[in-house]
Amino acid sequence: MARQGCFGSYQVISLFTFAIGVNLCLGFTASRIKRAEWDEGPPTVLSDSPWTNTSGSCKGRCFELQEVGPPDCRCDNLCKSYSSCCHDFDELCLKTARGWECTKDRCGEVRNEENACHCSEDCLSRGDCCTNYQVVCKGESHWVDDDCEEIRVPECPAGFVRPPLIIFSVDGFRASYMKKGSKVMPNIEKLRSCGTHAPYMRPVYPTKTFPNLYTLATGLYPESHGIVGNSMYDPVFDATFHLRGREKFNHRWWGGQPLWITATKQGVRAGTFFWSVSIPHERRILTILQWLSLPDNERPSVYAFYSEQPDFSGHKYGPFGPEMTNPLREIDKTVGQLMDGLKQLKLHRCVNVIFVGDHGMEDVTCDRTEFLSNYLTNVDDITLVPGTLGRIRPKIPNNLKYDPKAIIANLTCKKPDQHFKPYMKQHLPKRLHYANNRRIEDLHLLVERRWHVARKPLDVYKKPSGKCFFQGDHGFDNKVNSMQTVFVGYGPTFKYRTKVPPFENIELYNVMCDLLGLKPAPNNGTHGSLNHLLRTNTFRPTLPEEVSRPNYPGIMYLQSDFDLGCTCDDKVEPKNKLEELNKRLHTKGSTEERHLLYGRPAVLYRTSYDILYHTDFESGYSEIFLMPLWTSYTISKQAEVSSIPEHLTNCVRPDVRVSPGFSQNCLAYKNDKQMSYGFLFPPYLSSSPEAKYDAFLVTNMVPMYPAFKRVWTYFQRVLVKKYASERNGVNVISGPIFDYNYNGLRDIEDEIKQYVEGSSIPVPTHYYSIITSCLDFTQPADKCDGPLSVSSFILPHRPDNDESCNSSEDESKWVEELMKMHTARVRDIEHLTGLDFYRKTSRSYSEILTLKTYLHTYESEI
C-alpha cells in the first residue's frame, strides 16, 4: 500500500493542467516528462516567457506526440494551454470545413486538404476518413447496430503487440444518467450491455474533478497524491492552487505516478491524455484514430479522450433538467464516432475501451446555502473554501488568536435544521481518507446533500435578476448516491455481458496497468480486487505472510497473584466454582471452528500476543497494548440477549493464563475520572451463566470514554442481535485502533499519545467491528457455502457524542445512524490495525479482496 501522506516516496512526474470553464484541461503526451520533484524549495513554474516564438509551422506536425522545447513553437494538444502554438496551428490542425461526417454526395470526393475529414477513395489508406465513411460510402453498418459479440481473444492487425487501451472519461456523469438507456445513449448502452459494467463507481472525497481525475490516473487518495481540491493552499509553499491560476502548472503540487508515466517508464508508449477545451470532440476522436494508424514503432498503446460534458450542463441546469438530454446525446454520438472509427480500422475487436466518469451531480441552488455569519461573529477573520464542503483556515497565516476548537464549538449542533457538521479533520470518517495532508485545513465542514455553505450572503453571486447561476453541483460525501459515477469496460480483455459490484475509483489504476501488461507503482488500490472484471488475469494476488505467530498459554498463574482492584471472585458461590471457571479457560474445544469462521487473523508486524479461547469467543491478546488486538465471536439467529447479574456489575475477573504484568488494573480507571472500560465480547450475549464469567475477564476489557460506552453498549446489546436475526447469524470481529497521527495506518508504540491516567494502558482512537454473514440469508453464517456479505465500522473513540446532535435522546434514535456515517471497508481496518482477515476460506483470494474493498453505503438504490 502506498503511504497515505502528502510527502511520501512518490515521484512527482508531470504537470497537470485542467480547468473548468476556461481554456485548459488535463493533457499529456507520451514524452511529457518534466523534472521529478516533490520539494519544498523555490517554485519552478513553467512561465509563459519561453514559449513566445510562434514563427514556425505546424505543417505535417498537427498533434505531434513529441513535445517540442523552446525556443521552437508547438503543435501538440496542449500548445493552446501554454500559449505556445505555432502561428498556423488553428489553420492547419483545427480544420472544420465540410464538417465531421460523410454524406452521400461527398462519397468519392476529390481530396481537399482544407476538409476536417475526408470521404475520398484514398482516405482509408491515408488514415483520415470521417468515422462514418464505411457506413455511408461502402454500405457497412454502424457499430451500434451490430449484435453483441463475445470477443474471446483480441483480433488485432499485424504489428499490435498488445490490445490498445482507450480511456473515455466524462466529467460529472451521474450514475443514474444510465437509466436513460438506449433511447438517449444507444452507443453507451451497447458498451454497457455487451461488456462489463458496475451499477456505479464510487469517487474519492471530495467529489471534485481535480482530485478524482488524478486519483483515476494514480490509484492514490487525494491526501496521498496531494491534489486535495480544485483549489487549495499549501502553508509550506505559501502558495495557492486554483483553476484559473498559473500555480497549477508547478510540478511540486502533483504527487504519485500517473498511468502514462508508468507506461513510459516500462517502455510502453502513451498518447495524449486530455485535451484543451478549444479542440472539438470530433477532432480529438479523429486524432486518436490517426495515432492508432501510426507505424508500429511510433504508435502508442494507451490513449484518453476527455469530455467537459455533461458536467457543464449539469451545473447549469441541474441533473434532472430536461436540458440534460442533449448533452448526453452528444456524448453518445462521440462514443459512436469512436466505435465506428475503430470498426473502420478493423480495431473494434482489438481495442479495450473504458468509459468512466469522475463524479456525479446533485440538485443544488444558491437558495439552499448555510451562512457561517449566522453562527460566527468573526467570519471576516477566516478563509473558507466554500460550496458543497467547507474547509476553514485563518485569513492571516499563523494567527495566534485563531482557535479551531472554539469555531467547532460555535458550529456544532446550534440549530435544529442545520445542514452541515463541523469536524476536526482527524475526526472525519476514516473511509474518507481526508486528513493526512498539510493542504487539508484542520477544520472541515461536511455539508448535507443539496446544500452549500458560504461565509456570508455577500459571498454568493447571483444574476442581476436575483436567480442562481447554477442548478447543480458536486463535492459531497462520496457515499452519497448522487455523487456516484459510471464505469463500463468493453473489449477483448473484459468479460462479456457481465455486471460486477460497485467499487472505488482508486482500484482502476491497477486494472489499467494489467490491461497494458505494466507493473503498477505503489498506490492505495488493492491489486487483484477487480480481477473479476477481466477475462484472464495477469496478476494473481497471494496471501500476505504472517509476521508474528501467536502464543498459546495455558493456566500459568494463581488467583492470588492478581490484585485488579475490582475483582468479584469473592462473590462466586460455591467457592470451588472458581476453580472450575478457570479450568474452562484451558480447553480449546471447538471454539476455533465456531468463532473463527474464516481463519485466525494474521498479525503483519512484529509483536507478542496470545490466543485466548473461551466458550463464546476467541481473542488475540496483545501483551504490548494490554488488550485484545481482535476478538471474534459468532452469534446465531436464535441467540438471546440476557441481563447481567448484580454480583457481576462493575467488576472484572483475572485471567490466570496471562501474567499480572501484562494485565490491566481497575485502579487505573478509578484514578482517571474521564475514562471507563467496556468489553469486546458482549456479556449480554453469553450462552450460559458460566460462560458469562468469561466475558468479565480482564483480557476482554478495553478502555472507553463513558460517552462512547453508550454507543458500544447499544451496538452490543441491540444491533448485534438485530443483525444476527436479519441475516441468519453473523460473525463479529472487533478490536481497538490506534491512529494518533491520522495517516490511516497502524501507529507504532512511540506514536501513541494518550494512556489511561497513571498507567501503561493506551487509549484507542477508534474501535472497529467487522460483521460477516452469508449473502444468501437462507444459509446460516456458520454453514455458508456461497458468497459472503460484510458490514464494517470504524467508530471514533471520543469523550463526547457531539457528532450526533440528538445524543441526549435514547440511543435508539441516533447510534445506528452514527455507525452508518462511520461505515468502512475491511481494507481500511486492515491498514489501521496491521491485521489480515479472511485467511481460511473456500473462496478465491481475489473474491476475498473484492469483499475486503466493499463499502456498505446504506444509500438507496441508484
UniProtKB/Swiss-Prot annotation:
GO biological process terms held by the UniProt record: chemotaxis; immune response; phosphatidylcholine catabolic process; phospholipid metabolic process; positive regulation of epithelial cell migration; positive regulation of lamellipodium morphogenesis; sphingolipid catabolic process
Region named Phosphodiesterase domain: 144-501
Segments traversing the membrane: none
Enzyme active site: T209
Cofactor note: Binds 2 Zn(2+) ions per subunit.
Propeptide part(s) removed at maturation, as residue ranges: 28-35
Feature type site, description Essential for catalytic activity: K852
Pfam families xref list: Endonuclease_NS (PF01223), Phosphodiest (PF01663), Somatomedin_B (PF01033)
SMART domains, sorted: Endonuclease_NS, NUC, SO
Reactions catalysed according to its record: a 1-O-alkyl-sn-glycero-3-phosphoethanolamine + H2O = a 1-O-alkyl-sn-glycero-3-phosphate + ethanolamine + H(+); a 1-acyl-sn-glycero-3-phosphoethanolamine + H2O = a 1-acyl-sn-glycero-3-phosphate + ethanolamine + H(+); 1-(9Z-octadecenoyl)-sn-glycero-3-phosphoethanolamine + H2O = 1-(9Z-octadecenoyl)-sn-glycero-3-phosphate + ethanolamine + H(+); a 1-O-alkyl-sn-glycero-3-phosphocholine + H2O = a 1-O-alkyl-sn-glycero-3-phosphate + choline + H(+)
Modification comment: N-glycosylation, but not furin-cleavage, plays a critical role on secretion and on lysoPLD activity. Secretion requires simultaneous glycosylation on Asn-53 and Asn-410, while probable glycosylation of Asn-410 has a preferential role on lysoPLD activity. Not O-glycosylated. The interdomain disulfide bond between Cys-413 and Cys-805 is essential for catalytic activity.
Enzyme Commission (EC) number: 3.1.4.39, 3.1.4.4
Disulfide bonds: C58-C75, C62-C93, C73-C86, C79-C85, C102-C119, C107-C137, C117-C130, C123-C129, C148-C194, C156-C350, C366-C468, C413-C805, C566-C666, C568-C651, C774-C784
PANTHER family, alphabetized: ECTONUCLEOTIDE PYROPHOSPHATASE/PHOSPHODIESTERASE, ECTONUCLEOTIDE PYROPHOSPHATASE_PHOSPHODIESTERASE FAMILY MEMBER 2
Protein name: Autotaxin
Organism: Mus musculus
Gene (name only): Enpp2
